[in-house]
Amino acid sequence: MNIALDAVNNKAFTQATEAYQKILDKGKENNSFYLPARKGILTCRYEQLRQSPAERSDYLQIAGNCEKYMQEFGYTPTNIDILSLLAELYAYRLQQPDSADRLLDKAIRIPRLNPNTLSQLKSQRADLLTFMDNPWEATILYTQLEKANPNNDIGYEAKLKKAMLAYYAGDLLWAKAQFDVLKGATSKLISNDAIQMSHFIHMNYEAEGDNRDLEKMGRTEYLLYKQQFQEVLPRLDSLIGHCSPGISDYATLQKARSLCACFQDEEAAKLLSELKDRSEQVYIKAEALFQLAGLKRKQKELQQAKELYRLLVTDYSGSVYSIEAAKLYRDLEAGEQTEVNNL
């Protein structure tokens, strides 16, 4: 089991699947690892498909296997992870969000769920409602989560997502006020997102002027959230072409994200490379570097990734990415040293 878990942690999903299969081959009897291995294979297969373009039939097969698992082992608190995976498949891979919503509603009603699990399911359902173009119901759920979790990351994340909904809707000053509160969140990821969004609005908001471009950017990001890429890309090109540098550069970052989501990594890398050299905004340059380094890691161009992380640490030490970049740089160095030792 440890071999499988180590492989998962290293994103070596093929090796993890093989290790899980060896556990399953031993059968159910006197095999305490049987259920974790059944779950692990489903999760690994899903993660494998997410790494590159996949056929709908592949996702249907995983969904069918998840359904089979639930029929065999029941809708119980111990199987919430597979229920959650199945809802994600229906919502975002199989274009059946109504089925996902019904499944999450059923999951939320399972007796004896612990409070954290219940909150995570409600958060997943609120995300789905946002995706289904129902921001009002999503906001209600996020507000409930925020009140039920006033001093933990679940509550902070709900507040962040509620602020993003306000940003999408063009309520810029209210959204910024929420982002400002979240700058001190205990989760570095939430804090970083809040800092960046607050800074973006602050730098581009015109108190006495026209904020239509900023509002267009928010609406376009909502389309990006809903994975409507055919509509998103021309809108981003329009914003890049005619907006001020603050919005144009930010739109370029979002275009790179869109291209990555469509598995057009080479085009995304080219955009990010140009942006890091062109932009005069430090936070934009830092984010472009961080995104580009992540792409280089994905493409196994590890020396280039390491150099980009080094630049973030040395030249952008005040950015929200510097600490994470230092950690990733050390990880890459450790990997190189391991290879040398194995020669």
Model-identified regions with their sequence ranges:
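Acidic, polar-rich low-complexity tracts and alpha-helical solenoid repeat scaffolds
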Residues: 1-343
